[in-house]
Amino acid sequence: RRENPTVAGRDFELLPLREGRGRFLGSVIGVRPHGPHWWGEGEAKFHIDGDEALPTIVGTGSEDYVGLGWCVQATPYPYHGASLVEKSPLPDTAGPVSMYRWHLPDPIYWHGSMRATIQQIGVEITPQTAPRSFTQYLDCLRERQDDWSCCTFWYEPVPSAPLPPYPSLEERLRDLDLEPNLEGLPLQSGFVTQNTLE
């Protein structure tokens, strides 16, 4: 799934609503900031078994969800971390990142329904607004519109409800400055149908 840009005030969906029972395994999350300043104050939220207003599980920040703190560092641990952290040409900004969290030692099960999201909230700090207290820091929080993507893994019994339509390869790669080299790969509607990579 990819949303570029995300919609201010609407959480990015890691897992669309799934009904029935299942187990959430984790996500690989990509973020490309579209503006300056820190982007990672959004909370991961897990709405389990019908909770609406308040999710069963709520995190404290995007980097905290993947087991990091004080921004994102290239730290590939077995169950959480970041495998890619690039520098940004923008001041006071983390560049594009790829981070992940696997819920293997801390499984998340559901029995009725499940939906997982993460907020796009960041901090806008200038020399004039530099916070001197936690309350002032909270005043610097802003909804952001960046480029977020994810690949989420879960188990659920089949048959199950269909997923939202899968975007085309062109849409998934739009403005990434990548030329996909698919020559020689067996494709079916934009999917690699067997593992032929060495």
Label each residue range with its predicted role.
Residues 178-198:
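Glycan-recognition and processing domains
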Residues 1-184:
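Beta-strand-centric surfaces of beta-sandwich/beta-rich domains
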